[in-house]
Structure formats: structure tokens, C-alpha cells
Amino acid sequence: MKRLLGLAVSAIALAACDSTAPDTSMQETDTAHMEPASSATERTAGYSEDRNAYFGDLHIHTRSSFDAYIFNVRRTANDAYRFARGETITHPSGFDMTIAGGPLDFYTVTDHAEYLGILPVMNTPGTELSKLPRAQDMFSTDPEKITAAFQSVGASVRSGEVIEEMYDESIIGSVWEQNIDAANRHYVPGEFTTFAAYEFTSVTVNEEEDSFAGGNLHRNVFFKGDAPDRAFSTLDSPNPEDLWDWMDEQRSEGYEAIAIPHNSNVSDGQMFRLETYNGDPLDVAYAEQRMRNEPLVEVTQVKGTSETHPSLSPNDEWANFEIYDRLLASYQVSKTEGGYVREAYRNGLKLQEEEGFDPFRFGLVAASDSHVVGGAYDESDYWSKVGVVDGTPMARGSVPFFGKKNWDEQPDNQMVNNAREWFSRWAASGLTGVWAEENTRESIFDAFRRKETFATTGPRMKVRFFAGYQYSDDMLDDADLTRQAYDGGVPMGGDLVGTGEAPTFLAWAQRDPNMGALQRVQVVKVTSVGEAVYDVACHTGSPDPATHRCSDNGAAVDMETCAPTGAGANELKAVWQDPEFDVAQRATYYVRVLENPSCRWSTWEAMRGNVPPRPDVPQTIQERAYTSPIWYIPAD
């Protein structure tokens, strides 16, 4: 945190974006209280029993988050929803942001509940909070005072110990109501869906380092319709299990909600640990409560991808993708075990077999975690996430510092080190896809509940995955393929109960027409004792039956222009059977779709800056999508 604040102060000074200037703006320009749109009594336009693919971002911050406002973010929840619907918004560094690929179908502001909306009031002349010595230090021109004041807020969020003088429940409650109102105001059933939501900001403090570095245990909490008058935060308790208790209580009072954990990759191995928050053994009650409240997990976002890690999946050639492993506000490396979803699936199956419960039956989603109200989903149009801290190519380390034209002699200072350790390693990711009957809160939330969701690293590729016992290759070209798939099996997120015979799987993917062509579709199989990756559909034809791999389709990138070379597929589909299926063994299956190679955002920025790409990050990537799994359950 100290490093980040020091860099912020320098960036603010360099950009002449003075975050210490008094805040005279209104928190919201639209202040009329809005009730949520009533549940539709008639189906909206576009309703489909076979379900439509809708895309959205479930993790967005505004000026009301303490770690956005300090970095000169001044945009509101209303601005966030306008951005998602296609309006151009100004970045804190002064340039325009317009969403790549056109308007999204759904969007959610998830400001940190801790000290929600407090910093803007501390920086508003004449308020009681502005008179506090802590406020005067935080918005002074003294870097040491700014850093110390903001660190104290971070320490409070991590410990759960309230700073009484700045904890004004009336302000926090008012801003929470404003965020709810903004979600209600911009919700248009059938066109654009929003949810009242917030972030629960739990962090495990790393005792080995004298800083605020720690493991990320954050959750975003979403309400299906109405939301309660207050949000449960780490200032109530940093223990996620206490959050689940509160959610159960709210559900009994009519407030249906789910929580979605994110960035398990930097949880220091704590997100999927094999014991409770307080170190007790896991049990059936824990598993049931976790799955009731956390049916999904955010698998990819700007701070990296949490599917798997090369050390956990050494035989997966595509495991080393956008790996980010630095603890929050630290250069220290997060522990790998306990931090990745595929390993959690394996451990969950083992617990099911040995203990009779599985607390890790998550569906998959993705988001940006943007703190500037709008996500950067396109590698060729990237603006990172924090604000003025990483608002330029130099600040995020994609071009050499201070006008140099090569990477040989970079200065040894905090800005350079932060760019190397953090910002250059971040990713232009991601988006959630859902299969829902219509674009409404009820339909999309129900898709969350049944885990008929998929995650992408930014492109809006559509992916379906089914399992059953009646699928055949003859179905693939039928006009009613989707209806047959639903009628003959279960979709992603479902359980397939054994019948004594081997199931068949149906995988289908369609490219985003504005992004790269498809290279392959894979099925990832996980059991309690191992894993395997099978190519099941290839641009080049059928996979090799011995290696289960597609042949090379020759796709590449022209590194002078970032233009793709070679061909790829617009659509890939296959009916597949597991060649090593064991009728008696539980297994988890999910689909991973890979695009052809494309330039990473850092390469795009280096090309525009007429400098060589940064040598310590990949020059190209393969954008991808991940479906929620299907769980095979042997017959009794």
C-alpha cells in the first residue's frame, strides 16, 4: 500500500491531476429515489426458451470506493451505467473511454462497502469530516502525510477495526442508497440489466512482512431485486463465513443474494483452503452454506487469471496464461496451492469421496475490477484499472520510462518497480456470459444460481456445453440442436447422474465477430486424483486420437503491425466422449475455448510508442473462454 500511495502521489503531480483539490462536485446528478422495476408480468422482446447469450461486467468501482477516489477517480455509478450502454466517459488522466464492442447487456457497480463514499466527503470543504486531521493530511500536498493517512484506512479495512472519527453511518447509508437508486434507474427489462451490489473487502494480513500485504479474500455481493438498508462489510467482520450468516439472514427477510469471490490467485492460498477461516476442519454445514451463498467464482480479471497455474498443471500447455501472483499492495509472491480453481475442483471431489461434501462446486464468471467506472476489455484499447496511477503507457510499464527507446537501462525507482511487478503483469480482462431466457434481473440471476455461466478474457465469444446419454454427431447440423441438447441432457453448471454407461458431451463455440478467429475447443477433465486436457474441436479438423491435440493451424501475428496472420474458425462444435471414462469415478468437466494468437495490450502500446515490446511479459496471448463445469455423479 505504501508503494502504491507513493507512486500515486508522483503520478498525480506529474499529470497535474491534483487529487488534493477540494471536491465540489455532486455525488450524483440524479437524486430522485428510484424503486426497482417491477418483475415483468409479460415476457420481454427476445425471450427464448432455448436461452440467449448475454454479456456483462460484474465488478466495477466508482468514486465512492476509497481506493478509487484517492487516485483521482471522480465518476459516479450513473456514469458507470452510461459507459456500459455506450456513452463516452473521461478517464481520470484526461482521455476518453468508450466501451469496445458496443453496449453490454448487464453491468454492476460493486463499490467497497468499507467507508463507502466517505473520502469524497472528507475532501469537501465545510463538512465535519473535512475538519479531521486525518482528512487534512490525506488531501494535503505532503506525500508522507497522504500515505500515512490512506494507509490507516487500508489497515482498518484489513483488521476490521473501525476508525470511529471517519465512520459516519449516515453518509455510508446514503451513498449505498444512491448506488441502489442508480442501479434501479438504469435497469430496463429486456434491454439492460443492473443489480444492487457491493464489495466485501476481506484481506488476510501477511505476518511475515511489515506492511499491509495480504491475501485477497474479497467477495462481490449481488441482490436479485430489493436490497437491504445497509451492507455487511469487513468493519462488521472480516470473516467471510460471517458474511454468509448475514446473507442467510437477509434471505429469510426476502433479500435474495449471492456472493462471488475474486482473485483467488492472490489469496495467498487462502481462498480454497481445506479448513475454515478460523482453522477448523471443513464439514457438511460449511459446504452447504458456502454453495448456498457462493455458487460462482470470478476466474479472470485485470489482476490475472485463476483457472490454474503451470506448477499445478504441468502437462497443460496453456496453463501459463496471464499469471499474476503478487499479494495485494506487495511484491511478495502469493502461495499457489489453495489459490486456483482447477485445483479446488480436484480437492472438492476428494472431499466428496472421503467426507461426503464438496464446498468448491463453483460456476465461472469474469469481470474487469475497473476502478475508473469502465472496463478495458480490448487488448488494442487498454487503460488498466486504478486511475492516474496507471493511466499512461509509461506508468503501466509498456514503454520504457522517461523517453528511453530500449529496456536496457531503466532507472531503479518506485514507479519503475511498480510497473514491473504489478501493472505490466495485469490483463485486459474480462466479461461474464450467461445463458438466460431474457435480459431481466430475474432471468439472469436465475442463470447465476444454476451456474449456466461462462467467463471470457474480453471477447464476446459464445460457448455452450452439455452432457447426456443421447447426443450424436448427426445432431450437429440440425436447426434445433440447442433444443435437442437441453432435452437430452444437462447444460453447464449441472449434475449428470450416472446410468452405467459413458456419457456424451456437446461443446459449441462461436467467435466474437469483432475479435480473433477460433483455434480450438477443449474439454478439461478433473478427478480427485488428476486432470487431463482434450482438444475436441479444431479449426484444422479432428484432433489426433492418440495425443488428443489439434494440428497447428499456422495462425500467428505480424509483430510489426499486430495484424493476425493465418486462418481460424468462426464456429467450432463437437460431440465427444471421454476416452478414459470410469463409470464409478466422480469427475468435473468444463470447456475452454482458445482464439488464434493476438498481440497483448503491452505489445500494442510498445508498437504505438515505436519501442520494442517489454521483454519480461508475453508479446502475444490467446484470448479464451471458460464454461462452468458439469459434474458427473456415479449411480448409487
Annotated model-derived regions:
Residues 209-215, 220-222, 226-228, 235-282:
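Hydrophobic, small-residue-rich alpha-helical packing segments that form membrane-like cores
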Residues 18-77, 81-84, 88-136, 168, ...:
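C-terminal functional module detector
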Residues 14-16:
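C-terminal motif of bacterial Sec signal peptides marking the signal peptidase cleavage site
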Residues 66-71, 160-173, 224-237, 329-339:
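The substrate-binding groove and active-site-proximal loops of carbohydrate-active enzymes
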